[in-house]
């Protein structure tokens, strides 16, 4: 009997060892830990549908029925060309490699007092995000959706963060939905003042940011700054639905202390939920190279000429 039990124990130990090895070999690069193919549901949907013909909850984010695996802990992806699919990240994600693709992923972050995004691609190159969701598990004044550089974002949804997208050079946001951002009365990053919510913020000394056919709707966010805030050269804002903010689009040269060039805002439809009657605010040394085809969404009538002041 003792000998039989020794065989059983040895067999169980061998099976456990084999499972551990298989899990390690099959674990994608950048993972700290993950549950064994446990399905997980995307975070609950909030907000309202996008306007007809524009992205909304039904056309962005993780498709219904997608099997998702939970990944816990902060992750760094340093392997060129890696494809990451069907993950729910409970932790902050950083990309340092070239050509990493995230497909059908959910970014939830973790509790933190540090200012950081759910996904940071600033140190990578040619990152692609497709059909993904950004929604913090622990909303705070510190958490943005994505800090992006050399990144293409398609059919993705951002909600519950302070800013949706902080965009650096060569960032494209297309067919995506940014809405219901989180406002806080006290933001250490704003000197203790309230949060300064932007759907997309494009930074000074950056260039080539493109926003194409998105819904960026801050009409349900308390006291937002702008749907689009930009100090980046060669900005393109094309064929979007835009709403909310003090002014809906705010183009500002002042962080540069030089003229801001190549701003193109064309073919957009504007809501009427800005604090001021101000679809576009243009600072005095900002050049609006093109502004054709911008209309009020409810009437189809052309919007007024940009307000211009610093």
Q: Language-model segments: which ranges?
A:
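Extracellular beta-strand/beta-solenoid scaffold signature
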Residues: 69-72, 89-91, 109-121, 136-145, ...
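Right-handed parallel beta-helix
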Residues: 81-88, 99-109, 124-136, 148-162, ...
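Secretory targeting and sorting signals
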Residues: 2-25
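Beta-strand/loop edge motif enriched in small/polar residues
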Residues: 60-62, 70-72, 203, 211-217
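Acidic, glycine- and Ser/Thr-rich low-complexity intrinsically disordered tracts
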Residues: 38-70, 258, 262, 266, ...
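N-terminal non-globular leader segments, chiefly Sec-dependent signal peptides
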Residues: 42-56, 122-127, 137-140, 221, ...
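C-terminal region of N-terminal signal peptides and the immediate post-cleavage residues
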Residues: 17-41
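N-terminal segments that cap or nucleate solenoid repeat domains
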Residues: 45-108
């Amino acid at each position: 009997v003792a000998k039989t039990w020794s065989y059983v124990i040895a067999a169980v130990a061998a099976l456990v060892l084999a499972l551990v090895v298989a899990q390690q070999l099959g674990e994608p690069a950048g993972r700290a830990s993950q549950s064994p193919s446990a399905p997980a549901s995307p975070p609950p949907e909030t907000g309202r549908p996008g306007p007809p013909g524009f992205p909304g909850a039904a056309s962005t984010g993780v498709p219904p029925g997608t099997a998702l695996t939970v990944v816990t802990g902060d992750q760094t992806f340093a392997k060129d060309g890696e494809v990451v699919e069907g993950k729910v990240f409970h932790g902050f994600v950083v990309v340092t490699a070239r050509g990493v693709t995230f497909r059908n992923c959910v970014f939830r972050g973790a509790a933190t007092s540090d200012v950081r995004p759910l996904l940071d691609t600033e140190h990578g190159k040619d990152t692609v995000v497709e059909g993904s969701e950004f929604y913090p598990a622990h909303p705070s004044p510190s958490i943005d959706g994505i800090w992006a550089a050399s990144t293409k974002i398609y059919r993705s949804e951002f909600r519950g963060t302070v800013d949706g997208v902080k965009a650096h050079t060569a960032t494209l946001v297309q067919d995506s939905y940014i809405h219901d951002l989180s406002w806080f009365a006290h933001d250490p990053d704003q000197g203790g003042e309230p949060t300064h919510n932007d759907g997309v913020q494009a930074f000074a000394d950056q260039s080539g940011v493109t926003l194409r056919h998105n819904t960026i709707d801050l009409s349900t966010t308390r006291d937002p700054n702008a749907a689009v805030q930009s100090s980046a050269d060669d900005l393109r804002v094309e064929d979007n639905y835009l709403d909310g903010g003090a002014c809906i689009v705010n183009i500002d040269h002042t962080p540069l202390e030089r003229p801001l060039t190549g701003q193109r805002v064309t073919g957009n439809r504007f809501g009427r939920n800005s604090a001021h009657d101000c679809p576009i605010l243009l600072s005095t040394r900002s050049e609006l190279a093109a502004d054709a085809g911008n209309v009020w969404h409810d009437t189809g009538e052309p919007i007024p000429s940009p307000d211009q002041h610093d």
